[in-house]
Every structure is written in C-alpha cells, then in structure tokens.
Swiss-Prot record:
<keyword id="KW-0904">Protein phosphatase</keyword>
<keyword id="KW-0418">Kinase</keyword>
<dbReference type="InterPro" id="IPR003661">
    <property type="entry name" value="HisK_dim/P_dom"/>
</dbReference>
<dbReference type="GO" id="GO:0005524">
    <property type="term" value="F:ATP binding"/>
</dbReference>
<dbReference type="GO" id="GO:0000155">
    <property type="term" value="F:phosphorelay sensor kinase activity"/>
</dbReference>
<dbReference type="InterPro" id="IPR036097">
    <property type="entry name" value="HisK_dim/P_sf"/>
</dbReference>
<keyword id="KW-0067">ATP-binding</keyword>
<keyword id="KW-0812">Transmembrane</keyword>
<feature type="modified residue" description="4-aspartylphosphate">
    <location>
        <position position="771"/>
    </location>
</feature>
<keyword id="KW-0547">Nucleotide-binding</keyword>
<dbReference type="InterPro" id="IPR005467">
    <property type="entry name" value="His_kinase_dom"/>
</dbReference>
<keyword id="KW-0902">Two-component regulatory system</keyword>
<feature type="transmembrane region" description="Helical">
    <location>
        <begin position="251"/>
        <end position="275"/>
    </location>
</feature>
<dbReference type="InterPro" id="IPR011006">
    <property type="entry name" value="CheY-like_superfamily"/>
</dbReference>
<dbReference type="InterPro" id="IPR004358">
    <property type="entry name" value="Sig_transdc_His_kin-like_C"/>
</dbReference>
<keyword id="KW-0597">Phosphoprotein</keyword>
<feature type="transmembrane region" description="Helical">
    <location>
        <begin position="220"/>
        <end position="242"/>
    </location>
</feature>
Amino acid sequence: MFDFSLEAIVYAKAISLLATVAVVMMWLFYYCYRLKQKNEVIFGTHHAAYIAYSVCIIAWISSNAYFHTDLLPELGASAGMFMAKFANLASFFAFAFAYYFSCQLAAEQRKGKVHRWQQGIFVSLTVYSLFINLRPGLTVEHVDIVGPSQFIIEFGPHTSYFFIGLVSFVVLTLVNLVAMRTNSSKLTLAKTNYMIAGILVFMLSTAVIHLGMTYFMGDFSLTWLPPALSISEMLFVGYALLTSRFYSVKYIAYLALSVLLVCAIFVLPLGAIFIPLTESNQWLIAIPICALIGITWQLLYKKTSRYASFLIYGDKKTPVQQILSLEEDFKLSIDDAMRRLGKLLQIPNDKLRLVTSNYNETFYEEYLSSNRSVLVFDELSEELEYKVSAKRSMKALYDKMSSNNTALVMPLFGQGKSVTHLLISPHKSNNQMFSNEEISAVQTLLTRVQSTIEADRRIRQSRALANSIAHEMRNPLAQVQLQFEALKQHIENHAPVEQITLDIENGQAAIQRGRQLIDIILREVSDSSPEHEPIAMTSIHKAVDQAVSHYGFENEKIIERIRLPQHTDFVAKLNETLFNFVIFNLIRNAIYYFDSYPDSQIEISTKTGPYENTLIFRDTGPGIDETISHKIFDDFFSYQKSGGSGLGLGYCQRVMRSFGGRIECKSKLGTFTEFHLYFPVVPNAPKADTLRTPYFNDWKQNKRSNEHKVAPNVQINNQSPTVLIVDDKEVQRALVQMYLNQLGVNSLQANNGENAVEVFKANHVDLILMDVQMPVMNGFDASQRIKELSPQTPIVALSGESGERELDMINKLMDGRLEKPTTLNALRHVLGNWLNKNTASSACEAERE
C-alpha cells in the first residue's frame, strides 16, 4: 500500500517547482482580486484567457514536480505515463490559451472580435492534441524510471507533430503581439514589450529543453527548468495587464545584473566548499551559509551594483540615484536643481515647472487622490481608449493636459494632505514615456525636499513683497514730489489760495494711492485664507461701481477709458473688501499698458446663466500669448511687467474660490485680454435692483473734480538743448519735464522704447533719459538701436533697478544712471556733465565738416 510522507517530496527541484506553484497561485488570486476591485468584465475578454492560461501553468508545473519526487519510483511506470501525458496536455493548453489570449488582445485593440480562422486553429489543434494524448502509444509509449529526477520517456510517433503544434502557437502568439505594436500608443508598446519578454523567456526555454534536450538528445535532467521559468511569463504578462506604469528595460537589466553579480560572488567560493561535503554534512553547514548570505547580501549588492550601473548606463550612479542625489542641490538653489532634474528626465530646457497650486489645483484636485497620486498623460489616453465608462470623467482632464502639452502632473502634499505644489512636465524630448522608477524617484525626492521648497516659497514671497512695494511706490512718490514742486512754484508766484489747496489735495490723493498699493500688495502675499471672511448678497453692478470708485487713478484720462456694466445685473454672494482687491488687481494690470497702447480701453460687462453668472473684465491692450496663458495664475509668475510680485492673479483665484466661483483668462495676443469671473447663482435671491444704490454712478465726476494737470505744454526753444524723456509712467515723465523747464532745457517724451526710437529718428536730441523696464520695448533694446543710429548721443538710465544683471546691462549699454524719482540737483549735475560734452563733440564735428 502506498504510504505518502513529506520526505517523498523533499528534493531541491521538487521544492523549487512547488514554490513556483505557490507563487503563481498567489499571483492568480491577486490578479482576480484586482479585477474585482476595478469592476472589470472577465468572461468574453482577454482576462478569461489569461486566467485559463494561469490554471494550466499551475497544472503543468505540478505535474513536472511529480517527476522529481519519490512518488515517481514508488507509483511506477503506469503512473509516470499518465503524468507525462497530463503534463503534455497542461503545457499544450497553456500554450493554446496564451495564443488565444493574444488573439483576444488584438481583437480588443481593433475593437472587434477574434477572427474565425484564429478560432479554427485553436479548436483544431486542441482536438488533435486531446486525441493523440488520450489514445495510448501516440505521444508517450513508456517511462523508464531509475529514481527521482532520473527517468527516460519513450516518445510515440505523434510526438513530433505535437511539438510542431506547440511551436505554431508560440509563433502565432508572437505574431499577434508584434502586430499590436503597429500604430500603437507608447503605453501599448510598453505593454506588448513586457508580454513579449515574458513569453520569449518561457517559450524559448521550453523549446530548447523540451524539444532539444529531451526529444532529440534524450536528456531529461533539466525538464524542471521550463516550468520554473514559466513564472516569468506569468508575472510579466500579468503585470502588463494590471498596470499602466512600467520599468525601463535598462533598469530591469541593471537589477538583474546586480543580483547575478552578487550570486556569482556567493556561488563560486561557497560552492567549492559545499559540493565536496557529504550529504549529511551539507545540511550542517547550510544554516551558517544562509546566515552569512543574509548578513552580507546588502553590503555586496551595494558594492556590485555600481559596476552593474556602469555597464548598463555608463555611469556608476543610475538615473534613479542621480535624481535622489539632487536633494542637496535643492537646498542650494531650487531653480538650478529643477534644471538638473529636467536634464536627467530628458525634458526640454526649462520646461519642467514646480508651481504652487492656485489655479491648477482647482482642476486637478479631484483626480489627485490616494489611488492616483500622479497624473500621466499616456495612462489617461489608454483609459479613454479602452474604458467607455471613464470617458465622461476623464475627457476634460485629457483635453486639458493635451492642450497644455503636459505629460506629467505630480502633487506635493502639505499638512492635512492638501496639495501645496504641482510638478508639471511636458513630454520628453526623446518622446519616451516616464518610467516607473523615474516617477518613484521624483516622488521620493520631492517628499524629502518639501520643507525646502516651502521655505523657498516664503523667501520668494518676502522678496516679492519688498520688490513690489519698492517698484509700485515710485509712481505715487513721484506724484507727491511733483505736487510739492508745483506747490512751491505756486507759492513763489503768489497763486490764489484755491490753487494751493488743490495742490495739497492732489498730494494727499497721491499718498492715498500709495497706501492703496501697499494694501493690495500685502493682500497678495498674505497667507490668510479668504474662506474665513464673511460674505453677503449684493448687486454685482453696485460691487463693481464701488470697487472702481475706490481705486486711486492717476488722472482723469485713465477714467475716461473705463466702461462699467450697464445691463444684466445679478445678485452675487461676496465679501466687498475682497472683491474690491480683485477688481483693483485687474485694473492695475490693465492700466499698466495704457501709455504704451493709447487706444486700449477697459470694458466691464455681465452675463447671466442658469447655474452661474459671469462678470467679464476686458481690456484691449497687448493680450497674452496662448502658450503662457495657463501659467498666469501661478504664484510668482509675471508676464511683460517689471517689479510685480507675480502673486496678484493667484490671489484673485483664491478669492473667487472663496465665493464658490472661479476666474479664467481668455486672450488673443495683440488684440484683447478677458478675465471671466464666475459666480454661482444665488437661490431665492432678491432682485438686484433692491440691492443697488445710485450713489456710485457719478464716480467719474467725483474723480475728475480732484484731478489737476500740473505740467503745462512746453514750447520748444531752438536755442536750448533737447532731452528725450522715455518712461512708461506719465507722472515720471511729468516730474522730469518740470525740472527740465526750470533748467531751461527743451524736452520730448516717449512712453516706451519703440516710441523712443521713432521720436529720436524724427527729432534732434542732445540727451536721452531712458527708463529700463517698459512694455512693447524695454530700455536696453531701445538704447542698443539708438546707439546704432548715433553712438555719440548720451543715454542716461532713469531707473530704480538694483539687480546685478540690470546694473551690468546699464553699464554696458548706457552712459550713466539717475535714480528714479530724480531730483532737480541730480538732473542738473547730469545735464552739466553730458550736455557740455555733447555740445563740444558736436562743435568739433561741425568744424571738421
């Protein structure tokens, strides 16, 4: 009677095969669990074929394990013949279902069904295989048994045809997978590469050993190896089916080579010691050897992996290690570290961006959850292609990333798991996908440097505050200085009291404008959340009128270029103070270009809808390039505007979100810019008329009454030298013009660099006072062009710039520098230096002529 005990299977080959069975079974259970989690359909899809293939692999490995146990000699030749035929059928059906699995995949890719001829091949070969293996003597005639792992199978006459059928399935499977690569996406290519790799390892090992060594050479000692290697196909194919993120070929080769090198270090010396020992002594020394391997593995792996990296990548550090080593670089300079990171990821120059999550978070936050911590464009493409249910929810995200040429969005989570920053990357320059090891390495790196990034953000915030206040305050200070000069002249000329009072009021208005600018800037850089501010229902017309009436305009000419909403009022729930600052920001951005674009205007209008109402703020200035329009709500982003904090529009977005709405930008370069402020419809709201007050309708008249034009038109004196004043701010030009009048010098004005070149060509100019930062054309470019026309004409920078680069450019392109706002004495000194030199130079040239 047969007596089974564990000792019957305690053989290295049998244990290896049974361990493989355990791994495959666990993988199969996990695979089915993931399908259930994802609510995937199994029957009628490639999943059913893959599961059937996996079951056949388990049966095949188990039947092969039988031949390497004591069960083989104990049960005899008849049981051996049965298990040999069972192994034949298990391996055949594994190959057959692998083939049908590839047919099903190809059919799903083309959105069709498996071809009839493919089904015919599957059925016909299956019937034939069952026939020749179930009928005695056709594939296996006899099994000669010596002991475990020591046996010879005598094949029947149909064995060669049986193996031809297996080879046919291998070839047809590879043909299907290779055909799937044609006109496929990058993600589909990666999936098929993984599947082909797994199938090749398994099927080639089977073909070489089962066909070559057993059938032709009669050696059955290695028949256990193909079943053990079948795990490669299981894992590679299953991984490709379950995931959309893959490790690169080089990284897999690096890991494999590192492990092989460590194994070689252990096997060669330890094998020389272990093999000569008797079987009883081998077990005694096995335990300390295992302990030695466990203790030293990590150290040896760390050492040998450097050489593996050098062989694979040509560098002792892998790209993953190089990415993680950027941690110290981030502490020195985030911008430089981001450039190096972009280079390692093969991103085009300076296209990799780390932005705060003001605008983008509102769009991406619903997708950036714990189960989707990274948004990858290629993965979205696959979901839209294969999952009909995902199309509605994912289409908008796909279109957004596609329009912005975005390939990767990775969040940084702060306290409370809220998104603080977003790493946004375009597609790689080599058009490859982001590999799994790259994404994991970048995630780890950003987690490590998050505190550094947050500290840098606060430092930038402080710098932006200081820079913005310093820049913005120059204009109101110049206005105050201008009013003091005018007041001084009026007192000396014994002007009436009314005129002196008006000068004082104008000076006070300039001071108030300065205070307002400081309040706006402090609001921009504040970390306080607008969500906690109280909100109330109000008429949008009233809110706009009130905000505009409180804005500190420099002169009445600006007021004349603003059109307020006249029709379609609606009720909005908002905080008036916060809303005022939103309007202030939009007005300030628009009027910045008024001097350079004299025909530009501001038009504010409204539009109602069933779910949300819209306030449209339109200016017909320079417009915004479409390629950067999506960046304008990012913190510290400034476009064609010097001295700004780059925080204003991000603040506007936060405020609008606190109202339950949002702000969006629509622009056409060179034509217009529109900001659409969306407010949710207020249910059961009273009529807007009842919330409106007529008080603010006369805001233009109130503003005009306090405006006074200080600088009169100047008559050109042909006997006096002429100075060209170039500045985009009228108040700065007016102040310099007043000083030049007092010094008896003629003046011409230009509001940007391009205008300055035109004025210079049309008039005789002895000296140019040139601002640096201006729209349309800056002072550096204008100076370069003017110097090409007239190298002798002195150009003095009229600027408050203090940056190292700007000062270096001033020294290279200009002849001197005046602080802005300037003073009478400073201007007199410059005129004394340059006008005398220039007059002498002109006289010498005239004498030569």
